[in-house]
Amino acid sequence: MTYTGRTLGIGLMNGKPFAFYLLCSRSFPNRKAVIKGNAAYIINQTETDNPYVSYPVVRTNEMYAVVTNGLHTDFISQALVWEKPRKALVHVLDAMDYERDAYNTPRIAGIIERGSERGWLGFAGRDEFWVRSLRLKEGKAFVTATYNVDGFVELGLNGFSSAGELALEVLKLPLEHKVMAFGVTEAENRWAVEMSGRPF
Protein backbone atom coordinates (compact mmCIF):
# COMPACT_ATOMS: atom_id res chain seq x y z
CA MET A 1 0.00 0.00 0.00
CA THR A 2 0.99 3.62 -0.50
CA TYR A 3 1.21 6.40 2.08
CA THR A 4 -0.35 9.57 0.70
CA GLY A 5 -0.69 11.59 3.89
CA ARG A 6 -3.54 14.05 3.59
CA THR A 7 -5.72 13.14 0.60
CA LEU A 8 -8.78 14.80 -0.95
CA GLY A 9 -11.00 14.36 -3.96
CA ILE A 10 -13.87 15.93 -5.87
CA GLY A 11 -16.31 14.18 -8.15
CA LEU A 12 -19.84 13.51 -9.32
CA MET A 13 -22.32 10.83 -8.22
CA ASN A 14 -25.89 10.59 -9.51
CA GLY A 15 -25.41 13.95 -11.20
CA LYS A 16 -24.47 15.77 -7.98
CA PRO A 17 -21.04 17.00 -6.87
CA PHE A 18 -19.23 15.50 -3.91
CA ALA A 19 -15.95 15.98 -2.10
CA PHE A 20 -14.01 13.97 0.44
CA TYR A 21 -11.02 14.26 2.72
CA LEU A 22 -8.97 11.34 4.01
CA LEU A 23 -6.54 11.79 6.88
CA CYS A 24 -3.65 9.34 6.83
CA SER A 25 -1.08 10.00 9.53
CA ARG A 26 2.01 8.24 10.85
CA SER A 27 3.12 10.90 13.33
CA PHE A 28 -0.21 12.06 14.81
CA PRO A 29 -2.87 9.33 14.43
CA ASN A 30 -4.66 10.30 17.66
CA ARG A 31 -7.16 12.86 16.33
CA LYS A 32 -10.86 13.50 16.69
CA ALA A 33 -13.40 15.04 14.38
CA VAL A 34 -15.84 17.82 15.23
CA ILE A 35 -18.65 18.77 12.87
CA LYS A 36 -20.36 22.00 13.85
CA GLY A 37 -22.67 24.15 11.75
CA ASN A 38 -21.23 24.56 8.27
CA ALA A 39 -17.73 23.37 9.18
CA ALA A 40 -15.77 20.28 10.16
CA TYR A 41 -12.56 20.22 12.16
CA ILE A 42 -9.73 17.80 12.87
CA ILE A 43 -8.46 18.13 16.45
CA ASN A 44 -5.15 16.64 17.54
CA GLN A 45 -5.21 14.69 20.82
CA THR A 46 -1.44 14.37 21.34
CA GLU A 47 0.65 17.04 23.04
CA THR A 48 2.78 18.86 20.48
CA ASP A 49 3.91 22.32 19.43
CA ASN A 50 3.16 21.49 15.78
CA PRO A 51 0.66 24.15 14.63
CA TYR A 52 -0.48 22.18 11.58
CA VAL A 53 -2.16 19.09 13.08
CA SER A 54 -5.45 20.71 14.16
CA TYR A 55 -7.41 22.61 11.52
CA PRO A 56 -10.75 23.22 9.81
CA VAL A 57 -11.04 20.59 7.09
CA VAL A 58 -14.42 21.48 5.55
CA ARG A 59 -16.26 24.78 5.24
CA THR A 60 -19.47 25.23 3.27
CA ASN A 61 -21.64 28.15 2.24
CA GLU A 62 -24.78 28.40 0.15
CA MET A 63 -22.99 27.75 -3.15
CA TYR A 64 -19.63 26.12 -2.41
CA ALA A 65 -17.99 23.44 -0.31
CA VAL A 66 -14.27 23.78 0.44
CA VAL A 67 -12.09 20.87 1.57
CA THR A 68 -8.42 21.31 2.51
CA ASN A 69 -5.66 20.06 4.79
CA GLY A 70 -5.15 23.22 6.83
CA LEU A 71 -6.10 26.69 7.97
CA HIS A 72 -6.47 27.77 4.35
CA THR A 73 -9.95 26.16 4.43
CA ASP A 74 -11.42 29.27 6.02
CA PHE A 75 -9.43 31.74 3.94
CA ILE A 76 -10.55 30.09 0.70
CA SER A 77 -14.15 30.05 1.90
CA GLN A 78 -13.92 33.77 2.73
CA ALA A 79 -12.35 34.56 -0.65
CA LEU A 80 -15.26 32.86 -2.42
CA VAL A 81 -17.50 35.68 -1.23
CA TRP A 82 -15.90 38.00 -3.80
CA GLU A 83 -13.84 35.76 -6.09
CA LYS A 84 -14.45 32.85 -8.44
CA PRO A 85 -13.09 29.48 -7.23
CA ARG A 86 -9.99 29.41 -9.43
CA LYS A 87 -8.86 32.86 -8.33
CA ALA A 88 -9.66 32.11 -4.70
CA LEU A 89 -7.41 29.04 -4.82
CA VAL A 90 -4.61 30.86 -6.63
CA HIS A 91 -4.60 33.84 -4.27
CA VAL A 92 -4.88 31.94 -0.98
CA LEU A 93 -2.51 29.09 -1.82
CA ASP A 94 0.07 31.50 -3.22
CA ALA A 95 -0.15 33.70 -0.13
CA MET A 96 0.02 30.88 2.45
CA ASP A 97 2.35 28.56 0.49
CA TYR A 98 3.43 25.15 1.82
CA GLU A 99 3.56 24.35 5.53
CA ARG A 100 6.84 25.17 7.27
CA ASP A 101 7.09 21.87 9.13
CA ALA A 102 9.78 19.17 9.08
CA TYR A 103 8.33 17.67 5.90
CA ASN A 104 7.52 20.88 3.99
CA THR A 105 3.98 19.53 3.75
CA PRO A 106 2.10 20.85 0.72
CA ARG A 107 -1.21 22.63 1.07
CA ILE A 108 -3.97 20.97 -0.95
CA ALA A 109 -7.52 22.17 -1.59
CA GLY A 110 -10.70 21.26 -3.42
CA ILE A 111 -13.89 23.19 -4.19
CA ILE A 112 -17.24 21.98 -5.47
CA GLU A 113 -20.24 24.08 -6.47
CA ARG A 114 -23.92 23.35 -5.85
CA GLY A 115 -25.71 22.16 -8.99
CA SER A 116 -22.52 22.20 -11.05
CA GLU A 117 -20.46 19.55 -12.82
CA ARG A 118 -17.32 21.64 -12.47
CA GLY A 119 -14.84 21.49 -9.60
CA TRP A 120 -11.43 22.88 -8.67
CA LEU A 121 -8.25 21.45 -7.17
CA GLY A 122 -5.16 23.27 -5.95
CA PHE A 123 -1.70 22.34 -4.69
CA ALA A 124 1.04 24.48 -3.12
CA GLY A 125 4.29 22.61 -2.47
CA ARG A 126 7.87 23.69 -1.94
CA ASP A 127 8.74 23.06 -5.60
CA GLU A 128 5.32 22.79 -7.23
CA PHE A 129 2.25 24.99 -7.53
CA TRP A 130 -0.87 24.41 -9.59
CA VAL A 131 -4.62 25.07 -9.72
CA ARG A 132 -6.95 23.17 -12.02
CA SER A 133 -10.55 23.69 -13.12
CA LEU A 134 -12.04 20.29 -13.88
CA ARG A 135 -15.14 18.90 -15.54
CA LEU A 136 -16.36 16.29 -13.05
CA LYS A 137 -17.13 12.76 -14.25
CA GLU A 138 -20.00 10.57 -13.10
CA GLY A 139 -18.88 7.92 -10.62
CA LYS A 140 -15.32 9.24 -10.60
CA ALA A 141 -13.19 11.39 -8.33
CA PHE A 142 -10.20 13.56 -9.13
CA VAL A 143 -7.82 13.02 -6.22
CA THR A 144 -4.70 14.79 -4.99
CA ALA A 145 -2.58 14.28 -1.88
CA THR A 146 0.34 15.70 0.04
CA TYR A 147 2.62 12.75 -0.81
CA ASN A 148 3.14 10.15 -3.54
CA VAL A 149 0.55 11.43 -6.01
CA ASP A 150 1.84 13.10 -9.16
CA GLY A 151 -0.50 16.05 -9.65
CA PHE A 152 -3.92 14.44 -9.43
CA VAL A 153 -5.34 11.07 -10.41
CA GLU A 154 -8.76 9.80 -11.41
CA LEU A 155 -10.38 7.12 -9.23
CA GLY A 156 -13.62 5.21 -9.54
CA LEU A 157 -15.86 4.93 -6.48
CA ASN A 158 -18.68 2.56 -5.64
CA GLY A 159 -22.12 4.14 -5.50
CA PHE A 160 -23.20 5.95 -2.35
CA SER A 161 -26.30 7.88 -1.33
CA SER A 162 -25.08 9.96 1.62
CA ALA A 163 -22.05 11.80 2.93
CA GLY A 164 -21.57 9.07 5.53
CA GLU A 165 -21.55 6.33 2.91
CA LEU A 166 -19.02 8.34 0.91
CA ALA A 167 -16.74 8.59 3.94
CA LEU A 168 -16.97 4.82 4.43
CA GLU A 169 -16.08 4.22 0.77
CA VAL A 170 -13.06 6.49 1.07
CA LEU A 171 -11.82 4.53 4.09
CA LYS A 172 -11.72 1.44 1.87
CA LEU A 173 -9.03 2.97 -0.37
CA PRO A 174 -5.83 0.88 -0.20
CA LEU A 175 -3.72 3.50 1.57
CA GLU A 176 -1.55 3.30 4.67
CA HIS A 177 -2.20 4.72 8.13
CA LYS A 178 -5.80 5.78 7.57
CA VAL A 179 -7.32 7.64 10.54
CA MET A 180 -10.61 9.20 9.43
CA ALA A 181 -12.50 10.36 6.37
CA PHE A 182 -15.04 13.10 5.69
CA GLY A 183 -17.69 13.02 2.99
CA VAL A 184 -19.41 16.10 1.57
CA THR A 185 -22.48 15.70 -0.63
CA GLU A 186 -25.14 17.97 -2.04
CA ALA A 187 -28.41 17.48 -0.15
CA GLU A 188 -31.70 19.31 -0.51
CA ASN A 189 -31.11 23.01 0.25
CA ARG A 190 -27.77 22.33 1.97
CA TRP A 191 -24.45 20.51 1.98
CA ALA A 192 -24.27 17.33 4.04
CA VAL A 193 -21.00 16.66 5.90
CA GLU A 194 -20.31 13.39 7.71
CA MET A 195 -17.26 11.63 9.10
CA SER A 196 -16.19 8.02 9.49
CA GLY A 197 -13.13 6.58 11.19
CA ARG A 198 -11.79 4.44 13.96
CA PRO A 199 -13.19 5.12 17.46
CA PHE A 200 -11.12 7.09 19.93
Residue ranges and their predicted role:
Residues M1-F200:
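Conserved short alpha-helical segments that host acidic/polar catalytic motifs at enzyme active sites
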